Every structure is written in C-alpha cells, then in structure tokens.
Curated annotation (Swiss-Prot):
Renumbered residue ranges of the record's region G4: 636-639
Superkingdom classification of source: Bacteria
Assigned protein family: Belongs to the TRAFAC class translation factor GTPase superfamily. Classic translation factor GTPase family. IF-2 subfamily.
Compartments reported by the entry: Cytoplasm
Name of the protein: Translation initiation factor IF-2
Chief location of this protein within or outside the cell: cytoplasm
Chain intervals for the UniProt region annotation (G1): 532-539
Organism, scientific name: Saccharopolyspora erythraea (strain ATCC 11635 / DSM 40517 / JCM 4748 / NBRC 13426 / NCIMB 8594 / NRRL 2338)
Chain sites annotated for binding GTP: 532-539, 582-586, 636-639
One GO CC term, this protein: cytosol
Compositionally skewed regions (Low complexity) per UniProt: 123-145
Protein function: One of the essential components for the initiation of protein synthesis. Protects formylmethionyl-tRNA from spontaneous hydrolysis and promotes its binding to the 30S ribosomal subunits. Also involved in the hydrolysis of GTP during the formation of the 70S ribosomal complex.
GO molecular-function term, one example from the UniProt record: GTPase activity
Amino acid sequence: MAGKARVHELAKELGVTSKEVLNKLAEQGEYVKSASSTVEAPVARRLRDAFPKSGGKKGGGDSNGRAGGAKPAPPRPPESSGRTEAQAPKPGPKPGPRTETPSGERPKPGPKPGPKPGPKAPAPETKPFEEAPAPAAKADAPAQPRSEQPRSEQPRSEQPRSEQPRSERSGPKPGGPKPGPKPGPKPGPRGGGDADAGVVPPKPQSPKPGPRSPRVGNNPFGVGSGAPAQRPPRPGPGGGQRQGGQGPGRGGPQGGRPDRQGGGGQGAGTAPAGGDRAPRGEGGGGGNRPNPGMMPPRPNPGMMPSRPARSGGGPGGGRGGGRGGPGGGGGGRPGGGGGGGRPGGGGGGFRGGGGPGAGAGTGAPAGGGFRGRPGGGGRPGGPGGRGGAAGAFGRPGGPARRGRKSKRQKRQEYMDNMQAPSVGGVRLPRGNGESVRLRRGASLTDFAEKINANPASLVQAMFHLGEMVTATQSVSDEILELLGSEMNYKVEMVSPEDEDRELLESFDISFGDPGSSDEELMSRPPVVTVMGHVDHGKTRLLDTIRKANVQAGEAGGITQHIGAYQVITELEGNERPITFIDTPGHEAFTAMRARGAKSTDIAVLVVAADDGVMPQTVEALNHAQAAGVPIVVAVNKIDVEGANPAKVRQQLTEYNLVAEEYGGETMFVDISARQGTNIESLLEAILLTADATLDLRANPSMEAQGVAIEAHLDRGRGPVATVLVQRGTLRVGDSVVAGNAFGRVRRMINEHDEDVTEALPSRPVQVIGFTSVPGAGDTFLVVDEDRVARQIADRRGARIREAQNAAKRKRVSLEDLDKVLKETNQLNLIIKGDNSGTVEALEESLTKIEVGEEVELRVIHRGVGGINESDINLATAENTIVLGFNVRAEGKAAEVANREGVEIRYYSVIYRAIEDIEQALKGMLKPEYEEVELGRAEVREVFKSSKVGTIAGCMVTDGIMRRNAKARLLRDNVVISENLTVTSLKRFKDDATEVRDGFECGLTLSYSDIKVDDIIETYEMREKPRA
C-alpha cells in the first residue's frame, strides 16, 4: 500500500472491522484517533503480523460444531498489483468454514460431503479485497485447479482468491424441489462456483424433509437474513474461502444476471419459475451451469449500496442472495443461518451466532445478527431485525433514519415563523406582551439573555431601526424600550432602589429593620432637618441652639454643606437629645435638601417674616411633604422692621400648612434667631410633635445601618464621611460599605471633635477609614467581612458607571445625523471640591446652563480634595479648565499648570462659579451676523468687453457702491441673482474704491446676464452683538 495507510484501508485489507483494528492498535500501545487516521508503515506491519495469529484461532476452529475435516488452504501469493495480502480470515465476524457433515446427518442420502473438497476446505486467509464471485462454469468440475492459481491471472478479477470446495447447498423450492442428479460435492473448475463450501444440516421444520430436502445456504449478508444491508464485496477472502462463497445470483427470472446488491451466489433457494435448476449435488439450483460469460463485474466503490437492501433471501448463496424466489436463502459467512426468502427465512449470522437456516416459507428459530444476536428474517416472516456491520463506514445497526415531519408540525413551524417579528430580515423572538426587567445601563447582551435570543440578531435589528450600538455597549432606557416594542416585549427598567435591594439580597443582606421585637426596640432621639430659603436664618438658628457660631465660617454667609449636630434640651424636667441637620438653602443644593428630607423625622421650615414665602421655601416644603414628615414652621426675624408673621401664615395656607390658631395641625412658632427669642418654645414644639405623631424606636443590638449625609477628602485623615446611624450600633472596627466606597471604621468623631467608640441610633458621627470618598446620600451598612464589603462596592461602582455611560450616549437618528456631524464648541471642565455634596451641587448647576446648541459643557472629571498633578495632566490632554471649589492646588500642581498653560479658577461661593462659566460659554458662541444695506445703483447701459466681460454703466441712486462688496441683481423688483460680488469699480477710466450716490460708475459683477434698467443692490454682513 503506497504511502501511509489509513485505518479503514487496513481494515479492508485484513478483512476485519475498523473498530477491531483500533482496539488492536490500542493493545499495541499505539493511539489512533479514528478510522480515517493514518498509521506509519512499521505500525501497519506489526498490525499485519498480529492478525494472522488471532485470526487463525478464530477462523481455523469450527465454531458451529461442524466436522473438522476441512484444512486451511495455503496462503495465496500476493497479486501482481502489489497489494499486501493478509494471512488471516476476518477474525471476529466469521468463524471457520463449515466442513461437510456426514451424509448420515442429512435427510438426503448421497455422498454430499465427499472427500474431494476436504483438502481444499476453507483457507483461513483473508484477501485485501473481496470481489464478487464468478459464476461457476461447470458445477461438476473439480475445484483443485482453481485453488492453485491466483485470482490475479483472470482478466475480470484483480484480487487473488483462495478457493473452497463447494459443499452442497440446496434451498427447498415451494414447488417441490428435485434432488440433483449429482449428490456428491464436485467442485467446479471456477472459484466463482464455490458458493457452498460448508454444509449446513437442514432444519427439522423444513417443509420438504427426506432425500428431496435441500439445505438453506448460510449467508449473513443475504437479503432478509437479518444481516446488515447488502453491499458489494469488500477486499477479503474469496468466495471459495467463505462459507457458501459468492456465486451468481440466478434464481427465477433473474437467473442470468448477478445480484446488484450483494453479488449473486449459487444459493440454496431457486425460483419457482425461471432458469434451469442446478443439480442437487452442486449445492442447490442456481440456474444453468456456470460459464465465463456469467462472471460478475469487478467490484468498485460505486457498487456500494446507498440504502439497506430489502429483506428476502436471494436464490444465490453468496454474501448476498439476489432478489430470489420466495424460499431462497442467501448463503452467509461461517456460522450464519441462511437468509430467509420472502415468505420467511432464517437469520443470517455475522459472528458465529446464527442457527441453521430455515426452509422455504418458514421462519428460522435462531436468527443471526450482529455478534450472534437474534436478527434476520424475511419481510413477512423473518424472526428479527437486520444486523449491522461495524467499521469505518457506519455505526452498528445501519444508518438511523430521521422521521419525516407531519403536516401539522410543518404547518405549526410555518405559522411560528410567520408570526415571529422580522426587522431587516432578522428573525427575532416573539414576546406575547411579557415583561422583561432590565437594569439601568443594560446592554443588548443582557437583553438577549433575558429573552433567550442571539445578541448579534439584536445588534442587526437595532441597526435597521437606525441605532448603531454594539452587543456589550450600555444603551439608554428608551433604546431598550424601542427594541422591546418591536418584539412585543414590555421592558421594565429596574429602579436604583430595587437594583440595590436585589444586589444586597444576593449576599443575604437586607437594608432595614428585619422585624425586631418590642423588647429589642428602644427609644431614640428625633432627627430634625432645618430647611428654608437662603438667608432666612437657618444656620443662625442652629448656632443659637448650639450656642456656637458656624455661620461666620461659611463663605459668603451661606451654608454650602450639610451640618449634623446633637443637642440636649429639657422638657418637663427631662433631658432630651435632638439631632439637627442643617441643609443649604441655595437653589444649587436641591439634592442636598432632598437627602435631608429623606433621612429626617421632623422638618423645621424657617421663613423670614419680612420676606415671606420664597421659591426655595416652596421647594423645601415640597421635599418635606414628599418624604411624609411632619413640619414645624419657625417664623424668623420677627424683630426686623417690616416683619409680618401673619402674612407668612396666610401664604403657607395655600400650600396646605394651616396653623393651629386657624384650625389646622401645623405648629407655628415666632422666633428671633439673633435675639434668641422663643428658642425653647421651638424645641418644645419639636418634641411634642415627635411624641404625638411618631414612634421613635430602633433596635440598637443589630448591625448598624444609616445614611452618609456628606463626605469629603481630608488632607491628613483621608476620606471622611459624616454618617447618621438609623438602626443598630456602629462601632470602631466594623466593616462598612457606603455606595461604591468601603472600608473599616478606624476612628469616629462627634460634633465636638471628640473620639467615640460607638454610635447609637440617631447619632451623627464622622467616620474615618473609607478607601474612597462616598457619595452624599449613599446608604451605609455594616457587613461581616471586608471581602463582602469590597464585592458590594465594586458591583455598585460598575452599575453606576454603566448607568452614566448610557445616559451620556445621546440617541442619534439618521435624520439628526447632519446636526451631530456639525462642529460644536465644547468647554471641558474638571471640578474639585472640598466635599462630595458641594461637587455634586456645582456640577448639577453648571450642566443646567443653556447658552445655545453650538456650545456644550462637558465635565470630564470630578473629585473631592485638592488639585493634584494628575488633574493637571488630564486637563493638558483634554484642553480643560480646572475649577477648585474651596480647595487649592497641591504640591507642584500649580507649577505644572503654569508650564502647560492650564487655567485654574478658584471659587468659594457657588453662584460666582456659575456666573463665570456661563460667561465663558457665551464667549465660545459663534458670532451672529446681520445684513446691512450699502447702496443701490440703476443700470443705464451695458457694455461687452472681451477682456473683462459684461460691464454695467450705472447711476448710484442711494448710498454708496463699494468694491468687493456683496451685491444682488434685481429686475422688476425680482431678485435675479444672489450672493454676487462687485469685482471691479471705476469712475470713468480710474479705479475707484467706492462711489457715492448721484455719481455715475462702471462696475462688473460675478454675473454676466445684466440688462438695462436692472437694479444692483450692495450690502455687507456685520456681527450682531449678543444680548
């Protein structure tokens, strides 16, 4: 075999299955992956040497209990084609050839098992290729000359064949078989007639017992024998070596042609009509005496069957009986029963398991099959199913057929495909109004996982909908809702609170009281938030209560931070603590006021008696009412000239705050924070309201939970967060997580700058130990270990970034694409502040500035702490302005900024920063121009010049005509041409820069169709100052 041999080629050559070759190679320590793999020449040589030993054992013995008179024939020399010939028969599937049984065992007398075929009995050698047997020319000629001559000498066959003497093989005929005139087994001169090398004793249930009852051939590959589908002969031992070798299938009407499925064989069965019966002594009738013209065609791969052969044994006894008569049984390999005919046949054996063949029209009690399993049988009466051939060309049992779809199934699939939405040719899943919950900033991959779809299909669908997004890109809520509506899904965006709750539940953590008993609950101080308009005296009121002066330390006299304090007051002789939270009143601190209202028990609304209700007063009132907290109104500045407390009561009545003296439930207290008037009455009103309307109890034994009111970056202490404990007790050493910041409590400081070791409910403290600055308003909670805190913080940070990316991405449709592509001026900012609440308020206020679509503001970075070198480096790369709010440049940052030309602006009052940025944005606007008319001239004459073109002789009737000015041409008060230019202007023969009204001039325009009496109007574009 030239080159490297493949496993299935070696299996053909050795006459075994590919599985056995693979097993043998594994035993030899060679790893081969599959039947199509190649093996090296030394490995193939060892494989060939190994198989005769094992094959001789299997093939030489008489596995079916036959007489051992047959001797193995000597091995054949290699044929002229150079193909190596294996020295062993097929090891597993075919036991030794049947030797002839004594004549006494047969129902038919005669020297059938004559001694002649004895020496030429089955040769236990296999041939590389098993060809279709040639028809026997003369059935009574001895087979001795044929076994000595290699098959390669014959012109119609390429492979050498070892011959076996034909044993008698007769199939009972339905019409009464006649015994052949030559009962003795006389081998024919041609190997093709060796179809019956072994004798099978007839079954007792044969319908024609006695001397006239022939035996059924034993061909495991006969149609209907329970063997695998018939196929053309493979390389291997010739028909003379096999039990019932291959002979011409010539039963019945097909007596003269070989069988197309498996090659005909002179089998036992004969057709009731058709060709002449062969003598009984020749092993069954197969037609006329064989002759060379009946040789089958040479085997080739094209003869492989494309589908399993039909059941029903052929009249021949070869590897496959043809489509023979009703009782014909195909001869098989050693050990196999005869293939049953159409009425019923025995099972064909594959590996020595088949019982004796059945007679015509009867089922075989023991069928062959794969490895001796029951199988075989004809179409109507066969006892079992087909066997199977294992090897490189298929799995055992034949190819599995896939059932055809029913019409109902096809119709249902068609209807499903018709109802499935198709966007741009992409099939999408159909949702029947189902709800899909997605988090903020989700990607198309997240959406596809929810609906079990392909993300690439959603990307393609979005492209056809005019949206260009990737599968992993965070997309906005409206894009997800648009895509969901196309597929009939209802997209629900998870709120940040629900998303955070689901995140905590994944760690078996719940935020809130898990349900403490009454014994565990203890009373706590009320948390009071002071709210109101700017400059109405909120901080002065707290200073008076605390007997401190905080207002003097605030820039501009306005509060720009949230301050938290706890004071002790007396009520009915008992000292009662009250926690106060001071919120900014400036309009920029809306978010701070909202956070203060959410984390409070009672809201104190401070209104100046001289100013009355102001816009921030209404806003603070709305925050308190939205949070559902009771309100106590403090009418301040009653000592100021022009104060009118009654007016304040009347105005607040419009906002559902009715004073008690007017029959309402809201307590009004007239105070003077500067003079300290009625402060005790205000504190008493706060405590009475808390006792009357609130159940102020908390469980101090649980793990601490609360809210971060504000946070900042301290230069010496790092991130510092002011937290308000709402439940539980916070202790030094606890692992805490607040928003996307986490850490371990290293130190806690109260409002008097004193260290404390624990903080009970309603106690505000400053916590040191966070790894980063938490966001103002973030909830904090204590967890078991740092690892859990880090994981929660990381997931929160990733969620926040995705939501920000989705919000930044503006939805751009194809109609708005031209606007997007226009060049716009952009002002980049870096904001650094002293605490997170101030930075948030400043950024929110700056982004609300609107000066036009041509200029936009972009905050590329924000942070808490001083301005450092990394901020300057980022500003250098992005051409950015750095804003420092209550902070300064650290270290060499100022020096680097001067060297790189980065502008740093420092602010301490928020509204000044807002004004400066608004002016800067207006300065970046493109100038606006307006048209200003210069003059008009009437065309009196038109001259043609080959050098300069058309010359208009004009009289200036109004204004001036100026060279290089813009002009338009009017004819009968209709604009003929626009955007023209006065290219030349002359007064007589002299060039002129301008010509005033009342003078004549000659001019040329960038337009040649000028006629007499046309009007030339000149104008110029002047920049229009912005309001």
